C-alpha cells in the first residue's frame, strides 16, 4: 500500500499544475462516494455496451454545471460524437472468491464485525476502530491508475469541445459579443426590459496574477461611445439605446449622484486601467426616453456640460438595409450648458423662481492698458447673449484697479455662464470667482465658467471670422444690398475687444447650434448708452434694486415691489427698466404719461381689454419665437404660440394705425397698432395645421390634408394598402385552420396575432411555418409568415413617413423664422403694454403720486416713504421730507441715535429718485425731481478677504471711485465714512471728503455720521450744508430711548449706543460697566474742553482778534 504521505505529496504536485476544465467538473474525493462494485457476471463486451459506457462515465464523475444551457449543449454534443467511438474498458471492482453472507443467515456478531477487505481508506476514519484499515497495495495502484485514466478521458473530451481550458472565459465573452452583434448590433436595443449584464467571471485560484492577464472586449456600442467621449472629455455624455438613455463610466457615477438614479457597477475609467481589469463592462445608469429634458435640466443646473447622443437610424429601416448587423449610427446632436439651455419646455408656463435668473452667457476679454498696482488700468470688452430671447449686449470700457466698472455690468447682467477669452488679470479673475463661485452669490446660483485661448493674432482672426460669418449669412438671406451693407457696417464699427468676444461667442455657440442668434443684429444693444442713469454695483446692492441683502432673493427688493406683470416677457422688460432709469426727459414724459392714462382709465373698456388679453397669455412667447428660429420648437408649443398671437391680433384688427388704437399716449397707441400687423402671416400658418393633431403632438396628422406634402400622402396610401392586405389575409389563415372566420388581436402592443385554443382541433392544423409569439394556459398566439412580412413592410413605410413629417415640419419652421422680426416686434409691443400696466397697477396703490420733472438738479420730496419697507412693515411707515438743490442746500449731514432710521431715510430718497426716472409713480405726498445721471452709495462695513483688503481699505476705495465718477448731476450717499479707523483719522477723512463733494463736485449729497465735530461745517458753506437728525425721546433718565423716526433740524449730540446694547440683550453687567466708562470719558472730555476754552478766552483777551472769538463761540456751542 502506498503511504499516506506519498499520496498527499502526489495531490500537492497535481494541484501545483495548471487546473484543467475537467478539474472543475470532477467531484472531490471527500465529497463523492465511489460507485458500488458490480458482479463480474454482469460484464458485457466493450463493443456491445458503448452507450452504456458513456452513461456510466457520467455516473462516476458528473461534471459540475455552470449553467443549464451549457450543460445541455455539452451533453448532447458528447453523446452525438461519442456514439461511434470505442472507449477504454470500464474499471470494475473484482468480487472476492468467498460468497457474500446474506442478511438472513448472518449472526449479529458476524454482521457487526469489522470487515477490513470491504472498508475503504476513505471510510475507515468514521469507524469506532482504534487502528486504521490497511489496504492492499495492488488495489491502491489499480484505483490510482483507473482514476487517472478517467481524468484523462474527460480532459480530452472537453478540450475537443471547448478548446484549451484556460481560454474558456475568453470563449464565453466571445459568444456574448457575437450575440450582441446580431440583429440590432448591441444588447437590448428596442427592448423594454434590457437584460442585466453578467458579472465578470471570478479569477481562478491558479498562478499569481492570472486574473490580470484577462483583457476585456468592449461591445461595438461601447466602442462607439468611447469614440464620442474622447472628443468631449469635459462633457457628460448621455446616449440613446433603444428607448432608454444611458450614461457610461464616470458619467454614470456623476449622473447617479446628481439625479439619484442607480449606477450599475463596472469600469469608471476610459483607459483600460489594470485596477479595473476584473470588470468587462462600463458602469452604467439609465432612464426612459421621455424623461430626457427633466434630467438634462437638472444636470445643467448643477453646472455640468451635457451632450445628448441620439440614434439616427430606426429599427425597421435598419433591418431592411445593408448594415443590419452593425451598431446603430449615433451622433452627438445636442450640447447644453447653463447659458445655452433653451429647451426648457416645462418652465414656459410656470412662474419664474427669481428675477436674477436671466440666463445670459457673457464673454469677456481684457488687456492691460497702463500702470500696475493701484494705478493699473485695464481695457475690457464684453458681449452678453441671452439665447432664450435673442437679446445681445456689448460694451468696451476702461476700468481701474477696483474693477468697479466690470462689477457694475456683471451685477446688471447677472450671467448664468462666463466665457473667458485668454488670461484675465488677478483682480478681474478674483472678482468673477467671488461673484460666481457660491450658491448664495448675488446671481442667485453658482455660475459656470468656461475658458478659451487667445492667440496673439486674435484681433485679426476675429475680424476675418466675423466678416466671413456675416458675408455667408448675407448670401443665403433675402435682404437687399443696402440692408446687407448696413449690417456689415454695424458689425465692423465694433471695437477690437468686442470683436474678439463676438468671434469667440460665435465659435462657442456653433457647438450648440445657436450661432443663428447673431443674425439678429437689430437686437444688438450697447450697455453704456448715456441715455440711462448709472447704477453701479454698490448702488444695486446697497439699495437692494434686484435682491435683498439678507438671503439674496428678490423678495424685499425694488423690482419685487414694482413687479405686477402678467407675462414672463413683460417681466423681463420691466427688469431692464428698473436697472436702467431714463435720463432723457422726453422719453420719460412719454412713459409716465402712458402710466397715467392706464391708471386714470383703469375700468375703461380699452384698459380692461388689454388686461384681459395679457392675462390669457400663459406661454412665454419671446422664448417660443427664438426656439422657432433655432428650429427647436415642438408642435404643441408652436400651435399654442400661433393661436395666442392670432387671438390677440384679431382683437385689434380695427387699430392698424396709432390714431385708431383708442389711446392718446404715444407709447400705448404705437404698441397697440403694432399687434394686428402679424395677423395675416399667423393666419396663413395656422391654416396649414390640424389643431387637434398638433395639440396631441401627432406628427402624422399635423398638416391638414390639402396642405400635406406629396411624399407624405404617398406613404400614407402605402401604409393603408398594407393594412388592407393584412385584413384580406385573414381568409387564408381561416382556411388553414378550418375555420370560417379569424380575427386579429393585439396583446402587449403586438398587433395582428391569431389566437388558437389549446387542445382544440385548430391547434393540430396550425402550420409549422407559423411563429408562436405568446401563450397562456388556454390560448396560443401566432404570426403567419405573410403577417410578419407585411408588418415589416408597414414599419418601413411608417418610419419613412415619420422622417417625411419631420422634414415638412422643419420647412414650416423655416417659413415662420423668415417672419421672426415682425413677430418679435409684436411680442415686444405686448411686453411694453405689460410693463406699463404693471407700473399703472403700482400707481393705484394708496399714497403714490405722479412726480414732476424739472431741468435743474434737485430733490424736493414731501412725505416720502421707503417703498419696500412700507410693504413689509406691519405698522405705518413714518414719512419724511427731503429738500436738496444744486442752487441752495446741496448736502444734508444726518446724525441721530443708532437704529433711529438714518439709513432708511437716505435710502428712501434715492429710491424715490430712481422710481421717478423709471417712469413710475412714487410713494410720497409730492415729488419734484431733477434728472440725475447717477446714484452712488457707500454704505455698510465689509472687508474683502479675496482681495486682501480691510474694512477701511474697502471704504476708501469705494469712496475714491465715487469721487472720480460723480458729477454735479449725481446723487451721493455716504454712510458713516471713517468708522473703520481711529476717531481722529476718521473725522479728518470724513470732513475732507464732505468738503470736496460740496465744493468741487457739487453733487447732491446725503452724509450720515456719528461725528458731532462735523456739524460745525454747516457755517462754513453758507447754506449749502444743512444739519438734520432723527428725533427721539429719552425716558427713565436716559436709560430708555423712544425712536420717533422723524427728521428734524439740528444735530444729535449722542448716539445712544448703550440703548442698542440693551435691545440686543447684552448682559446687564456689561452695560453697567459701559455706562461707568462712558460717564468717565464724557467727564474727562468735558474738563479738557473747559480747559481749552479757558486758554481761548485768555488768548482772546490778549489778542482781541475776531478769529479767536469765532473759535470761542464754536467751543461754547459744542459744550
Curated annotation (Swiss-Prot):
Residues 1-19 have a biased composition (Low complexity). The keyword DNA damage applies. GO terms for cellular component: nucleus. One of its GO terms (molecular function) is ATP-dependent DNA damage sensor activity. Its main location: nucleus. It comes from the Eukaryota. Residues 49-60, 183-198 have a biased composition (Acidic residues). Residues 1-148, 173-215 are annotated as: Disordered. GO terms for biological process: mismatch repair; mitotic recombination. Residues 134-148 have a biased composition (Basic and acidic residues). Keywords: ATP-binding, DNA damage, DNA repair, DNA-binding, Nucleotide-binding, Nucleus. It is found in: Nucleus. SMART domains: MUTSac, MUTSd. Component of the post-replicative DNA mismatch repair system (MMR). Heterodimerizes with MSH2 to form MutS beta, which binds to DNA mismatches thereby initiating DNA repair. MSH3 provides substrate-binding and substrate specificity to the complex. When bound, the MutS beta heterodimer bends the DNA helix and shields approximately 20 base pairs. Acts mainly to repair insertion-deletion loops (IDLs) from 2 to 13 nucleotides in size, but can also repair base-base and single insertion-deletion mismatches that occur during replication. This is DNA mismatch repair protein MSH3. It comes from Phaeosphaeria nodorum (strain SN15 / ATCC MYA-4574 / FGSC 10173) (Glume blotch fungus). The lineage of its organism: Eukaryota, Fungi, Dikarya, Ascomycota, Pezizomycotina.
Amino acid at each position: 500500500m502506498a503511504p499516506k504521505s506519498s499520496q498527499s505529496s502526489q495531490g500537492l504536485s497535481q494541484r501545483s499544475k495548471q487546473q484543467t476544465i475537467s478539474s472543475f467538473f470532477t467531484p472531490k474525493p471527500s465529497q463523492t462516494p465511489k460507485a458500488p462494485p458490480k458482479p463480474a457476471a454482469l460484464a458485457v463486451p466493450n463493443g456491445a455496451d458503448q452507450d452504456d459506457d458513456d452513461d456510466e462515465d457520467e455516473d462516476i464523475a458528473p461534471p459540475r454545471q455552470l449553467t443549464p444551457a451549457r450543460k445541455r449543449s455539452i451533453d448532447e454534443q458528447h453523446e452525438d460524437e461519442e456514439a461511434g467511438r470505442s472507449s477504454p474498458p470500464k474499471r470494475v471492482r473484482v468480487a472476492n472468491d468467498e460468497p457474500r453472507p446474506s442478511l438472513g443467515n448472518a449472526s449479529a456478531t458476524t454482521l457487526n464485525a469489522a470487515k477490513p477487505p470491504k472498508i475503504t481508506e476513505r471510510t475507515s476514519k468514521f469507524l469506532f476502530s482504534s487502528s486504521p484499515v490497511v489496504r492492499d497495495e495492488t488495489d491502491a495502484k489499480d484505483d490510482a491508475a483507473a482514476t487517472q485514466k478517467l481524468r484523462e478521458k474527460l480532459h480530452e473530451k472537453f478540450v475537443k469541445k471547448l478548446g484549451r481550458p484556460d481560454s474558456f472565459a475568453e470563449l464565453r465573452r466571445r459568444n456574448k459579443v457575437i450575440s450582441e452583434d446580431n440583429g440590432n448590433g448591441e444588447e437590448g436595443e428596442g427592448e423594454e426590459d434590457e437584460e442585466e449584464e453578467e458579472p465578470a467571471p471570478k479569477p481562478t485560484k491558479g498562478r499569481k496574477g492570472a486574473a490580470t492577464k484577462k483583457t476585456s472586449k468592449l461591445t461595438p456600442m461601447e466602442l462607439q461611445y468611447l469614440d464620442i467621449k474622447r472628443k468631449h472629455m469635459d462633457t457628460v455624455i448621455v446616449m440613446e439605446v433603444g428607448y432608454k438613455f444611458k450614461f457610461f463610466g464616470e458619467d454614470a457615477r456623476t449622473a447617479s449622484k446628481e439625479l439619484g438614479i442607480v449606477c450599475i457597477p463596472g469600469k469608471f475609467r476610459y483607459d483600460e486601467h489594470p485596477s479595473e481589469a476584473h470588470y468587462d463592462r462600463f458602469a452604467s445608469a439609465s432612464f426612459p426616453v421621455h424623461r430626457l429634458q427633466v434630467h438634462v435640466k437638472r444636470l445643467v443646473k448643477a453646472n455640468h456640460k451635457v451632450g445628448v447622443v441620439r440614434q439616427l437610424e430606426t429599427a425597421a429601416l435598419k433591418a431592411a438595409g445593408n448594415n443590419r448587423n452593425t451598431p446603430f449610427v449615433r451622433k452627438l446632436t445636442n450640447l447644453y450648458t447653463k447659458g445655452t439651455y433653451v429647451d426648457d419646455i416645462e418652465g414656459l408656463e410656470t412662474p419664474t423662481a427669481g428675477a436674477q435668473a436671466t440666463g445670459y452667457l457673457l464673454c469677456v476679454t481684457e488687456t492691460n492698458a497702463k500702470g500696475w498696482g493701484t494705478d493699473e488700468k485695464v481695457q475690457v470688452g464684453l458681449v452678453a447673449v441671452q439665447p432664450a430671447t435673442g437679446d445681445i449686449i456689448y460694451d468696451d470700457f476702461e476700468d481701474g484697479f477696483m474693477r468697479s466698472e466690470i462689477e457694475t455690468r456683471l451685477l446688471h447682467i447677472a450671467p448664468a455662464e462666463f466665457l473667458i477669452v485668454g488670461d484675465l488679470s488677478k483682480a478681474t479673475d478674483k472678482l468673477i470667482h467671488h461673484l460666481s463661485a457660491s450658491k448664495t452669490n448675488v446671481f442667485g446660483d453658482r455660475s459656470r465658467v468656461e475658458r478659451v485661448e487667445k492667440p496673439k493674432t486674435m484681433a485679426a482672426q476675429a475680424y476675418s471670422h466675423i466678416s466671413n460669418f456675416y458675408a455667408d449669412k448675407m448670401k443665403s438671406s433675402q435682404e437687399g444690398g443696402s440692408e446687407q451693407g448696413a449690417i456689415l457696417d454695424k458689425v465692423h464699427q465694433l471695437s477690437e475687444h468686442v470683436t474678439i468676444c463676438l468671434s469667440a461667442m460665435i465659435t462657442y455657440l456653433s457647438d450648440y447650434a445657436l450661432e443663428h442668434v447673431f443674425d439678429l443684429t437689430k437686437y444688438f444693444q450697447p450697455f453704456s448708452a448715456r441715455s440711462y442713469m448709472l447704477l453701479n454695483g454698490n448702488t444695486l446692492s446697497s439699495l437692494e434694486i434686484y435682491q435683498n441683502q439678507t438671503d439674496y432673493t428678490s423678495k424685499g427688493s425694488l423690482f419685487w415691489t414694482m413687479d405686477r406683470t402678467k407675462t414672463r416677457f413683460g417681466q423681463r422688460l420691466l427688469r431692464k427698466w428698473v436697472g436702467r432709469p431714463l435720463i432723457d426727459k422726453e422719453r420719460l414724459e412719454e412713459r409716465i404719461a402712458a402710466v397715467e392714462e392706464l391708471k386714470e382709465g383703469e375700468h375703461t373698456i380699452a384698459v380692461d381689454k388689454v388686461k384681459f388679453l395679457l392675462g390669457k397669455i400663459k406661454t412665454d412667447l419671446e422664448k417660443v419665437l427664438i426656439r422657432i428660429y433655432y428650429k427647436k420648437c415642438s408642435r404643441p408649443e408652436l400651435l399654442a404660440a400661433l393661436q395666442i398671437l392670432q387671438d390677440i391680433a384679431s382683437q385689434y384688427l380695427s387699430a392698424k394705425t396709432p390714431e385708431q388704437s383708442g389711446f392718446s399716449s404715444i407709447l400705448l397707441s404705437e404698441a397697440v397698432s403694432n399687434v394686428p400687423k402679424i395677423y395675416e402671416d399667423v393666419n396663413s400658418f395656422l391654416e396649414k395645421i390640424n389643431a387637434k393633431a398638433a395639440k396631441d403632438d401627432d406628427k402624422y396628422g399635423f398638416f391638414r390634408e390639402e396642405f400635406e406634402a406629396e411624399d407624405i400622402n404617398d406613404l400614407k396610401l402605402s401604409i393603408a394598402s398594407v393594412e388592407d392586405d393584412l385584413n384580406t389575409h385573414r381568409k387564408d389563415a381561416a382556411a388553414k385552420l378550418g375555420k370560417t372566420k379569424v380575427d386579429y388581436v393585439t396583446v402587449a402592443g403586438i398587433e395582428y396575432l391569431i389566437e388558437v385554443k389549446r387542445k382544440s382541433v385548430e391547434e393540430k392544423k396550425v402550420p409549422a411555418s407559423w411563429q408562436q409569439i405568446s401563450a397562456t394556459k388556454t390560448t396560443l398566439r401566432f404570426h403567419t409568415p405573410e403577417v410578419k412580412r407585411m408588418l415589416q413592410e408597414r414599419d418601413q413605410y411608417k418610419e419613412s413617413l415619420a422622417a417625411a413629417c419631420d422634414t415638412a415640419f422643419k420647412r414650416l419652421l423655416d417659413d415662420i423664422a423668415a417672419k421672426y422680426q415682425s413677430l418679435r416686434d409684436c411680442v415686444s409691443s405686448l411686453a411694453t403694454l405689460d410693463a406699463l400696466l404693471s407700473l399703472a397697477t403700482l400707481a393705484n396703490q394708496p399714497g403714490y403720486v405722479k412726480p414732476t420733472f424739472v431741468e435743474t438738479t434737485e430733490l424736493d420730496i414731501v412725505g416720502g416713504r421707503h417703498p419696500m419697507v412700507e410693504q413689509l412693515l406691519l405698522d405705518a411707515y413714518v414719512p419724511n421730507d427731503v429738500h436738496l438743490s444744486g442752487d441752495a442746500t446741496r448736502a444734508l449731514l444726518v446724525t441721530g441715535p443708532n437704529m433711529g432710521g438714518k439709513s432708511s431715510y437716505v435710502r428712501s430718497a434715492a429710491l424715490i429718485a430712481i422710481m421717478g426716472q423709471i417712469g413710475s409713480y412714487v410713494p410720497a405726498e409730492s415729488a419734484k425731481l431733477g434728472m440725475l445721471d447717477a446714484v452712488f452709495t457707500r454704505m455698510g462695513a465689509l472687508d474683502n478677504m479675496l482681495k486682501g483688503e480691510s474694512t477701511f481699505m474697502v471704504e476708501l476705495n469705494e469712496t475714491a471711485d465715487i469721487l472720480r465718477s460723480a458729477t454735479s448731476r449725481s446723487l451721493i450717499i455716504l454712510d458713516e465714512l471713517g468708522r473703520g479707523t481711529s476717531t481722529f483719522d476718521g473725522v479728518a477723512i470724513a470732513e475732507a471728503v464732505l468738503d470736496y463733494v460740496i465744493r468741487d463736485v457739487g453733487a447732491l449729497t446725503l452724509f450720515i455720521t456719528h461725528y458731532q465735530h462735523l456739524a460745525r461745517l454747516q457755517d462754513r458753506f453758507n447754506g449749502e450744508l444743512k444739519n438734520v437728525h432723527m428725533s427721539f425721546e429719552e425716558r427713565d433718565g436716559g436709560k430708555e430711548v423712544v425712536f420717533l423716526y422723524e427728521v428734524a433740524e439740528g444735530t444729535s449730540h449722542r448716539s445712544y449706543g448703550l440703548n442698542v446694547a440693551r435691545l440686543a440683550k447684552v448682559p446687564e453687567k456689561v452695560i453697567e460697566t459701559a455706562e461707568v466708562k462712558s460717564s468717565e470719558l464724557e467727564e474727562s472730555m468735558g474738563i479738557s474742553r473747559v480747559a481749552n476754552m479757558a486758554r481761548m478766552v485768555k488768548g482772546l483777551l490778549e489778542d482781541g482778534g475776531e478769529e479767536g472769538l469765532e473759535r470761542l463761540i464754536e467751543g461754547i456751542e459744542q459744550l
